[in-house]
């Protein structure tokens, strides 16, 4: 089996999503292995415009399995909105989309830290999208993050309370979109 990998050599926005969209009809598996919802790719499918931030663009290929790997950081609100938007067009998400149980979740506190960090840089700010991606990867590498697989546990909120949220003394509404109740196929590994 041949494998092709599309990798961007800049900071994103090179048009990877458009290239993948063109090529998806030739592949059985489309996998997203890293990144977050800071950018999106716009796809026209059956006369309708769709903007995807997390879900691979192979979702429109009726024969392709789409994977979201453990290197991807997922904003549950954006992810749920994408799924809801696609289901309005009767796309069979449940049989075509798998997500790693090790993919990390972007929390509201990650966005707060991102905004605070960017503001503190003054004229030297980096132009963050303020979507919490950098702080989520910091938690991932520091082994403090909340992962998709954690949502299966009855007491996943305890892990959240024991994470950096408790250390920095903030309070957040825990998963207001109820995305932890979505029925998705999760890859156990």
Task: Outline where the language-model segments fall.
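Non-transmembrane, aqueous-exposed alpha-helical and coiled segments at domain scale
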Residues: 1-159, 163
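Catalytic phosphate/metal-binding cores of nucleic-acid and nucleotide-processing enzymes, i.e., regions
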Residues: 160-189
């Amino acid at each position: 089996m041949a494998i092709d990998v599309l990798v961007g050599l800049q900071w994103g926005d090179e048009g990877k999503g458009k290239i993948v969209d063109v090529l998806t009809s030739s592949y059985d598996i489309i996998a997203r292995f890293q990144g977050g919802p800071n950018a999106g790719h716009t796809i026209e499918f059956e006369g309708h415009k769709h903007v995807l931030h997390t879900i691979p663009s192979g979702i429109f290929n009726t024969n392709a399995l789409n994977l979201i790997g453990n290197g991807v950081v997922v904003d549950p609100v954006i992810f749920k909105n994408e799924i809801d938007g696609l289901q309005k067009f009767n796309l069979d998400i449940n049989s075509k989309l798998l997500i790693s149980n090790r993919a990390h979740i972007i929390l509201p506190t990650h966005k707060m830290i991102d905004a605070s960090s960017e503001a503190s840089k003054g004229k030297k700010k980096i132009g963050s999208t303020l979507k919490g991606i950098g702080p989520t990867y910091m938690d991932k590498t520091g082994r403090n993050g909340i992962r998709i697989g954690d949502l299966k546990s009855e007491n996943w909120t305890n892990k959240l309370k024991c994470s950096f949220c408790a250390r920095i003394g903030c309070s957040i509404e825990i998963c207001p979109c109820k995305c932890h109740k979505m029925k998705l196929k999760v890859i156990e590994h």
